[in-house]
UniProtKB/Swiss-Prot annotation:
Binding note for cofactor: Binds 1 heme group covalently.
Stated name of the protein: Cytochrome f
Chief localization: plastid
Function: Component of the cytochrome b6-f complex, which mediates electron transfer between photosystem II (PSII) and photosystem I (PSI), cyclic electron flow around PSI, and state transitions.
Length: 320
């Protein structure tokens, strides 16, 4: 009887442990996978401001390069690749939220012209699917299918991101024309320095909020520091809280000024934006161009043949 009760208790505890583990995994998995899109989507109706600045730069303060490659021209209702490259030194490690060091993630936002959108899976070729890998793209808004976001994803595997894009057909979409259109892209590597609510992350430099003498430095049990700065003139004290991650630059007894850096800047990532142009080409115009080129080539051929015929006539008259 006692063995049966013990077995039931162990079974109950194991079931509870597994359930809690699954819940924690689902919650953390969701928060990590949605972190980059949510930060931009929750705070901004449009990721590109009227000035042309992409809003991701509000949180990722360092400026880094990004590159985009698209075809010069595409035909209507055609799937093509938009390749976004986010280069960085793969040896770099960033400060994670818990203060430890880890690999960098990357993310991107692609702003297409109205009418262009993510290609449906059944229109994507096997070769393109292999280039895309396991990436999962999503629209910035349900009503903005022309704006796509991705990330954060592992930077070591996806520093080059292939977006499968479907071009619109003006025959079915009356608001689309055969024109040259701009495409805008923003790409980041690493964590941001500021959260959307304006608070700092632990991936940035921390400055003194007061001037005076560092009277006390307390190292917290879970990492980070509590720094007390005393004003020698009136004895007023300010306390600056440093989260885990940044390295401390000051020591007790040191005299510091207002806004003087208390830590280093641990950020190794950054954000960049770029643009490209693409032409939505009219098939009739292409056919007309091909017909024109063919007619020019035929005219040249007939001209050469006529010239040879004329030379033969001249040669025969001279011999006569």
């Amino acid at each position: 009887m006692q063995n049966r009760n013990t077995f039931s208790w162990v079974k109950e505890q194991m079931t509870r442990f597994i359930s809690v583990s699954i819940m924690i995994y689902v919650i953390t998995r969701t928060s990590i996978s949605n972190a980059y899109p949510i930060f931009a989507q929750q705070g901004y109706e449009n990721p590109r401001e009227a000035t042309g600045r992409i809003v991701c730069a509000n949180c990722h303060l360092a400026n880094k390069p990004v590159d985009i490659e698209v075809p010069q021209a595409v035909l209507p209702d055609t799937v093509f690749e938009a390749v976004v490259r986010i280069p960085y030194d793969m040896q770099l490690k960033q400060v994670l939220a818990n203060g430890k060091k880890g690999s960098l993630n990357v993310g991107a936002v692609l702003i297409l012209p109205d009418g262009f959108e993510l290609a449906p899976p059944d229109r994507i070729s096997p070769e393109m699917k292999e280039k895309i890998g396991n990436l999962s793209f999503q629209s910035y808004r349900p009503t903005k299918k022309n704006i796509l976001v991705i990330g954060p994803v592992p930077g070591q595997k996806y520093s080059e991101i292939v977006f499968p894009i479907l071009s619109p057909d003006p025959a079915t979409k009356k608001d689309v024309n055969f024109l040259k259109y701009p495409i805008y892209v923003g790409g980041n590597r690493g964590r941001g320095q500021i959260y959307p609510d304006g608070s700092k992350s632990n991936n940035t430099v921390y400055n003194a909020t007061g001037a005076g003498i560092v009277s006390r430095i307390v190292r917290k049990e879970k990492g980070g520091y509590e720094i007390t700065i005393a004003d020698a003139s009136d004895g007023h004290q300010v306390i600056d809280i440093i989260p885990p991650g940044p390295e401390l630059l000051v020591s007790e007894g040191e005299s510091i000024k207002l806004d003087q850096p208390l830590t280093n800047n641990p950020n190794v990532g950054g954000f960049g934006q770029g643009d490209a142009e693409i032409v939505l080409q009219d098939p009739l115009r292409v056919q007309g161009l091909l017909f024109f080129l063919a007619s020019v080539i035929l005219a040249q051929i007939f001209l050469v043949l006529k010239k040879k015929q004329f030379e033969k006539v001249q040669l025969s008259e001279m011999n006569f």
